[in-house]
Regions:
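Alpha-helical transmembrane segments of multi-pass membrane proteins
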Residues: 46-60, 84-107
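Hydrophobic transmembrane alpha-helices of multi-pass solute/ion transporters
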Residues: 1-18, 35-43
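Membrane-interface interhelical connector segments
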Residues: 31-45, 75-79, 84
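Transmembrane helix-loop junctions in multi-pass membrane proteins
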Residues: 1, 25-37, 62, 144-158
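Juxtamembrane and boundary regions of transmembrane helices in multi-pass small-molecule transporters
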Residues: 99-158
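Hydrophobic alpha-helical transmembrane segments of multi-pass integral membrane proteins
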Residues: 15-24, 43-76
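Selective recognition of specific alpha-helical transmembrane segments in multi-pass small-molecule
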Residues: 8-26, 138-147
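Hydrophobic transmembrane alpha-helices that form the pore/transport pathway of multi-pass ion
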Residues: 62-96, 120-125
């Protein structure tokens, strides 16, 4: 096992996570999260519930990591949940959407394609994989909306 190579890879990943955590805490401490949450909450509960999975999906896609997405946007989802009395629902949605959408990010696509090229020459292009991933993410978004509005309407989570 090449420990030097593993350490090089780990440093980049850990550095990215630390940066997302620092950015998240900076946004939280400076009141930025509260300001964004209040602005979104002023749009009404239905629009807020609609935007929650978009926030989570964006964070997972942007960071290429469910953990990184959560580190970046979970404080915002917690604030939105507190404003709508749906903390459990919105934090669950953040965790799920960030994790699922990370698989459509470019780092995941490049990794999957690189591995596939070791075993086959008939591998879709990055663009084809991204288009497929975004179609799946769109379907997931609709399922998340159905879940959110069902749970919120029937008040399954308090």
């Amino acid at each position: 096992v090449d420990h030097a190579m593993l350490w090089q890879r780990a440093k980049g990943i850990l550095g990215g996570l630390v940066c997302f955590l620092l950015m998240s805490q900076l946004m939280l401490e400076n009141g930025m999260v509260r300001a964004i949450a209040n602005a979104l909450a002023s749009l009404g509960k239905d629009l807020l519930l609609f935007s929650s999975p978009l926030i989570g999906m964006f964070s997972g896609f942007l960071t290429g990591s469910g953990l990184g997405g959560n580190a970046m946007m979970m404080p915002l989802q917690l604030q939105l949940g507190a404003l709508t009395q749906a903390e459990s629902l919105l934090t669950a949605i953040q965790n799920s959407t960030a994790g699922h959408t990370a698989f459509t990010s470019l780092p995941f696509i490049l990794m999957a394609r690189t591995i596939a090229l070791d075993y086959s020459t008939d591998v879709p292009t990055e663009g084809e994989l991204l288009a497929f991933g975004l179609k799946v993410a769109s379907l997931l978004f609709l399922l998340y909306l159905l879940t959110i509005f069902s749970v919120a309407h029937f008040q399954m989570i308090h």
